[in-house]
């Protein structure tokens, strides 16, 4: 497995594989890899001859400097895991390599609508940072396929729109959420949880599934349902951040034409911001 830190060397390897007629898959990550990331690598391996994994903690998508500073950097361990999983190349650039002129003068990519709604409304600039780094990676790697986790539901929708709007010839694959046995979605940020908080964390998943059951039973009093869930989260020790039930295809409020809903949840538990989502078929 190759470990590369510069775009020049990355392009050289990509060019060689292209000349050999290889199909290339990209798995963008911010490192601190867990089993959820490994399922992305497995999916990429099933769809391509070459698997490239990027490991880059992207400063442009952090709105809080303290959050950026404490995000875990575990490159050596990440590379060991990726080597065992069969990745072909790890691209691990520094911020100075990706943004040589600094963030203030960096050209950016913005996806109208999706960048500023829902999570984007409370995290200004976050999705601009996501769209910009993903675009840079797409330009550097020029993959045939790219794999992203469905845990970041709005991010996945944004990347799909980016690909459509910019004309990238890339298949975007959403990979289902990987969960612990108690339902908690695997996340690099779960490491921020204390032992006591880790015991409480699955409550987020449990309340999400309770909302799913209400939708299955025909309840459409969305605001009331979300208010009750927020109160239950507070009683359990969480600080609710974002709770939405939206059309799974458009991320707009549900209407009579909606056939699928998505429950989007984010809440703070101690120093960890936990996110999760679940899709519900409304036609049953």
Curated annotation (Swiss-Prot):
Residue numbers binding beta-alanine: 61
Name this protein carries in UniProt: Pantothenate synthetase
Extra remark beyond the main annotation: The reaction proceeds by a bi uni uni bi ping pong mechanism.
Keyword Nucleotidyltransferase: no
Catalytic reaction annotation: (R)-pantoate + beta-alanine + ATP = (R)-pantothenate + AMP + diphosphate + H(+)
Catalytic residue positions: 37 (proton donor)
Keyword Transferase: no
GO molecular function: ATP binding; pantoate-beta-alanine ligase activity
Compartments where found: Cytoplasm
Sites where the protein binds ATP: 30-37, 149-152, 178, 186-189
Family membership: Belongs to the pantothenate synthetase family.
UniProt KW keywords: ATP-binding, Cytoplasm, Ligase, Nucleotide-binding, Pantothenate biosynthesis
GO biological process, one term: pantothenate biosynthetic process
Domain of life: Bacteria
The protein's assembly and partners: Homodimer.
Gene name tied to this protein: panC
Function: Catalyzes the condensation of pantoate with beta-alanine in an ATP-dependent reaction via a pantoyl-adenylate intermediate.
Residues that span the membrane, as ranges: none
Family annotation (CDD domains): PanC (cd00560)
Top-level EC class as recorded in UniProt: ligase
